[in-house]
Amino acid sequence: TPVEEEKVACILEAARVAPSAANLQPTRLVVIDNAEGMEKLSRAANVYSAPLAIIVCADHAKAWKRPADGKSTVDIDASIATDHMMMEATSLGLGSVWICWFDPEVVAHEFGLPETFEPINVLAIGYSDEPAKSPDRHATERIPVGELLACH
């Protein structure tokens, strides 16, 4: 089942308003919603038969770097945008999968990405064949807050 254009627009808006270091907004998105594009993407990643995928890229030309050590925050910025899109997709009744196991060189080649763009992750989105999992599962599937805290 295709994802409705209105829902795609809401998901993209969630990425657009995501915060970024120094508000430089280095995240760039490649939206794939057709069979040809999904076939190209499947050469680099398992997209789980999703009807929609978003390649989340970081434009290194717009990177903010921490002065103390030069750490670029583009991966972080792209990840924040991805998380915002996932939460929006969930709120719209969609399922999503954050994919990091892919070949970035194949993605860059297949989609003609500019030299300064690095594909950070792929977000596959669609209607799940399975019912949504209960948030109650976090009580057993996630570490307790006490383990999460490094110092307390």
Residue ranges and their predicted role:
Residues 50-54, 112-134:
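A glycine-rich helix N-cap at a beta->alpha junction
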Residues 69, 122-152:
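C-terminal helix-cap and adjacent tail motif
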Residues 93:
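Structured binding elements
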Residues 58, 101, 127:
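Short secondary-structure boundary segments
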Residues 99-116:
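Active-site helix/loop module of the DD-peptidase/beta-lactamase fold
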Residues 7-81:
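Glycine/small-residue-rich phosphate/adenosyl-binding loop
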Residues 81-90:
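Acidic, metal-associated active-site segment
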Residues 1-6:
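A short beta-loop-alpha structural element at the N-terminal edge
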